[in-house]
Amino acid sequence: MDISIADLRLDYNLEELLESETSADPFIVFKQWLERAVSSGRLEPNAMTLATISPEGKPRARMVLLKDFDPRGFVLFTNYHSAKGQELIANPNAALVFWWGELQRQIRIEGTVEKISEEESDNYFFVRPWESRLGAWASNQSEVISGRDILEKRLTELKEEYAGREVPRPPHWGGFRLIPSLIEFWQGRPSRLHDRLCYYRQEDGSWQRQRLAP
């Protein structure tokens, strides 16, 4: 089947994004938008693109899951030895993007990351399914392996080792919090004249909101 990518287009006309109807606090807006995405029935509405910077200064991006947020920032979990973990440790500048196509909405976030506390990482790790906790031990994330059988063999060994027991959190596994300096909300509109409200964090911790041309 031939696909004409140039002809793929959608008319955005679901909603509008107005200052008069939007909170001055971007975290309140984010919560409202996330709740709407969850109620829409979208598969994994907490999925987001995480962009990092490689040691060579090149951008890298992949999908991850948001696992918590509050006025301090947005939390994700990973293996600290993984490519993204090492990149975030070496260069804390990062960006997140949420795309909810059914709602014709996007959120773009820029900021810097920091490791969350050991206690916070423990609290999340121990609510994960038992086999997911084993998986954190089984995989040396981002390392080259000869085949999947290596992972399956290691998982089987760990199941035997921890049968009937709690699985501890690996010291190399935990969370990062992205502390935002910019949060932009995008709502699709007709004629490609989309609504964009961008919040910029000020030195005193407050937020300045500005409308951007689409």
Curated annotation (Swiss-Prot):
Its cofactor is FMN. Substrate binds at residues 9-12, 67, 124, 128, 132, 192-194. Binds 1 FMN per subunit. SUPFAM superfamilies: FMN-binding split barrel. It is an enzyme of class 1 (oxidoreductase). FMN binds at residues 62-67, 77-78, 84, 106, 141-142, 186, 196. Pathway: Cofactor metabolism; pyridoxal 5'-phosphate salvage; pyridoxal 5'-phosphate from pyridoxamine 5'-phosphate: step 1/1; Cofactor metabolism; pyridoxal 5'-phosphate salvage; pyridoxal 5'-phosphate from pyridoxine 5'-phosphate: step 1/1. One of its GO terms (molecular function) is FMN binding. GO terms for biological process: pyridoxine biosynthetic process. Its EC number is 1.4.3.5. PANTHER family: PYRIDOXINE-5'-PHOSPHATE OXIDASE, PYRIDOXINE-5-PHOSPHATE OXIDASE. Belongs to the pyridoxamine 5'-phosphate oxidase family. Catalyzes the oxidation of either pyridoxine 5'-phosphate (PNP) or pyridoxamine 5'-phosphate (PMP) into pyridoxal 5'-phosphate (PLP). This is Pyridoxine/pyridoxamine 5'-phosphate oxidase. It comes from Microcystis aeruginosa (strain NIES-843 / IAM M-2473).
